[in-house]
Regions:
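Short, acidic loop-to-helix structural element flanking the phosphoryl-transfer center
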Residues: 13-28, 73-80, 135, 191-206, ...
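Short active-site oxyanion
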Residues: 26-31, 51-52, 148-149, 210-211, ...
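Short hydrophobic/aromatic-enriched beta-strand-loop microsegments
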Residues: 51-57, 174-175, 231-235, 249-251
Length: 267
């Protein structure tokens, strides 16, 4: 029986890559499932030798981190794209809209920086990824580009009405949850065909695994847990996830996932 070990990143993994690498060298099937894009995930995971496709942007992408290319992806339907961006614009919000090009590069559209964290997002990534930011007067679908992800960080009260309205749009899934690192919340919108759970199933089929052992910390890991044969919440996970976990393991700051894998994996 082959087990695919699949972990969230923020608040769950992101600490000691060396311990995980040793297990991968010994044959462990390991990857990540995260809301992060290929842009930030590739940089943060550069010290972990992941050869199994990663599930990125909540399942929008199956992504080959080594070769920096998509194995598969789900795009937002055109009608849904314009309906969603209009909801944001009516409330004077400027989300970051991710496009994946036929050339394998990303374009991120935005109209303005409404909060310092939005400029910070831009500054930390500008010139550091395989693609470009594009400031626009209004959101548009560019030639040979496919809309895949719409994201905004803001206060709960600012985002909740947008979340409620966006959920009524066909063809998309809305993920709304608290940020691990700041007092803000994330609203992420993407194709309804995508989810961490669906992505995990696709990876499972690609690598010929029989079972999934999942690790997470936040509400956006609940669907992944519903699919997993074994599910483990780190000690710092939200109560909702700890309640449905088979076991609560060490917190992320103490390398909870890596330490668990060392004990659990048998080459």
């Amino acid at each position: 029986m082959k087990t695919l070990y699949i972990s969230d990143m923020d608040g769950t993994l992101l600490n000691d890559g060396g311990k995980v690498n040793e297990l991968i060298k010994n044959g462990m099937l390991f990857t990540v499932a995260t809301a992060r894009s290929a842009i930030s995930a590739a940089e943060l995971l550069k010290d972990i030798d992941i050869s199994v496709p990663a599930v990125l942007m909540n399942g929008v992408f199956l992504f080959d981190l080594k070769n920096k290319k998509a194995v598969a992806y789900h795009e937002i339907p055109k009608d849904a794209f314009f309906a969603i961006t209009e909801i944001f614009v009516r409330r004077n919000k400027s989300p970051f809209v991710f496009f994946y090009g036929d050339d394998g590069k990303f374009t991120i559209e935005y109209t303005d920086f409404k909060l310092p964290i939005h400029r910070d997002f831009y500054e930390k990534r500008k010139g550091k990824f395989f693609g470009e930011f594009k400031k626009v007067s209004e959101y548009e679908i560019l030639d040979d580009m496919h809309p895949v992800f719409i994201s905004l960080s803001d206060g709960y009260d600012e985002l909740k009405p947008i979340y409620d309205a966006a959920q009524k749009t066909d063809g998309v899934t809305c993920s709304f949850y608290a940020d691990t690192y700041t007092p803000y919340w994330f609203l992420e919108i993407y194709s309804s065909k995508a989810s961490k759970a669906n992505g995990a199933q696709e990876v499972m089929a690609l690598v010929g695994a029989d079972k999934i052992a999942a690790f997470g910390d936040n509400r956006n890991d609940i669907l992944l847990f519903s699919l997993a044969d074994r599910k483990y919440a780190v000690k710092n996970a939200v109560p909702e996830l700890r309640q449905i976990a088979d076991e609560v393991i060490g917190e992320n700051n103490n390398d909870g996932v890596a330490e668990f894998l060392k004990k659990d994996f048998k080459a």
